[in-house]
From Swiss-Prot:
Region (Interaction with YWHAE) residue spans: 189-256
Lineage: Eukaryota, Metazoa, Chordata, Craniata, Vertebrata
Region: Interaction with KATNB1, residue numbers: 64-189
Lipidated sites in chain (S-palmitoyl cysteine): 273
Subcellular location: Cytoplasm, Cytoskeleton; Cytoplasm, Cytoskeleton, Microtubule organizing center, Centrosome; Chromosome, Centromere, Kinetochore; Cytoplasm, Cytoskeleton, Spindle
Gene: NDEL1
Region (Interaction with DISC1): 241-280
Interaction with NEFL: annotated span: 191-347
Modified residues (Phosphothreonine): 219, 245
Protein name per UniProt: Nuclear distribution protein nudE-like 1
């Protein structure tokens, strides 16, 4: 209205009609504005009621959400505590498992070392077993040789016994011959003094007496000895068919000495064989005891191969008979404490 220019009126009627028309126009616009205002107020009231309802719903929803949020916070706190507890337990379990793993690895290493030691001990035992088998085979071979030698020596011992009987018989006969020879010599001296012209007759009588004494032995001889050794009548030197000469007596004494030396050599061989058999038996028991102890031992002890020393007859093994010791002049020859040719045998 202020901005509008008021036109110039020529008359009062025009001015009145103008202002009347303008008032009606403003009245109509006022009426429209009031209707719009009423309509706007009604719409705003409806909108306010709707917004209030929505606000109530939003507040209720907000309260519910806050309650849910608080509940979720509590749950989150509980889950955090539970997670921390689970993490602590898991850490403890992991640390325990790591310790167990380290201990298991250490035990595994120890078991590997123990297995290697057992393998080495097994190899040592196998080598010792092979060496023991070889030594046992050698021992069995030597034992068989010793048994054969022992059987041979037993046969020689039986022969020695028969020789001892014959030697004793020959000694008795030689003693009787010496006594009778002394008697004959005394008788010859007496006869020479009494009758020096008949020496041949006395010699013939003496030879006949010597032959008679030789035909009758002083000691009885067994049946087996009579079958083995010839009697004085069957000696081809002429003891039973011709007079006993001094050379024949000397040869008989030499035979007796040779027999005594053979008897001494046989006794020394027999003593060596008995010592060897005893030592080999003790050695065999010692070896079997060592083998059993080495197999049953669980701490890896090794088999000792230099713990026992025995003796064997070098002459028996090599087939060489050493020279016998000089015999005693009597019948019984002393048995040596250690036979010749004995050497230490290490196993």
């Amino acid at each position: 209205m202020d901005g509008e220019d008021i036109p110039d009126f020529s008359s009062l009627k025009e001015e009145t009609a103008y202002w009347k028309e303008l008032s009606l126009k403003y009245k109509q616009s006022f009426q429209e504005a009031r209707d719009e205002l009423v309509e706007f107020q009604e719409g705003s009231r409806e909108l306010e009621a709707e917004l209030e309802a929505q606000l109530v719903q939003a507040e209720q929803r907000n309260r519910d959400l806050q309650a849910d949020n608080q509940r979720l916070k509590y749950e989150v706190e509980a889950l955090k505590e539970k997670l921390e507890h689970q993490y602590a337990q898991s850490y403890k379990q992991v640390s325990v498992l790591e310790d167990d793993l380290s201990q298991t690895r250490a035990i595994k290493e120890q078991l590997h070392k123990y297995v290697r030691e057992l393998e080495q001990a097994n190899d040592d035992l196998e080598r010792a077993k092979r060496a023991t088998i070889v030594s046992l085979e050698d021992f069995e071979q030597r034992l068989n040789q010793a048994i054969e030698r022992n059987a041979f020596l037993e046969s020689e011992l039986d022969e020695k016994e028969s020789l001892l009987v014959s030697v004793q018989r020959l000694k008795d006969e030689a003693r009787d011959l010496r006594q009778e020879l002394a008697v004959r010599e005394r008788q010859q001296e007496v006869t020479r003094k009494s009758a020096p012209s008949s020496p041949t007759l006395d010699c013939e009588k003496m030879d006949s007496a010597v032959q008679a004494s030789l035909s009758l032995p002083a000691t009885p001889v067994g049946k087996g000895t009579e079958n083995t050794f010839p009697s004085p009548k069957a000696i081809p030197n002429g003891f039973g068919t011709s007079p006993l000469t001094p050379s024949a007596r000397i040869s008989a004494l030499n035979i007796v000495g040779d027999l005594l030396r053979k008897v001494g050599a046989l006794e020394s061989k027999l003593a060596a064989c008995r010592n060897f058999a005893k030592d080999q038996a003790s050695r065999k028991s010692y070896i079997s005891g060592n083998v059993n102890c080495g197999v049953l031992n669980g701490n890896g002890t090794k088999f000792s191969r230099s713990g026992h020393t025995s003796f064997f007859d070098k002459g028996a093994v090599n087939g060489f008979d050493p020279a016998p010791p000089p015999p005693d002049p009597g019948l019984g020859s002393s048995r040596p404490s250690s036979a010749p040719g004995m050497l230490p045998l290490s196993v």
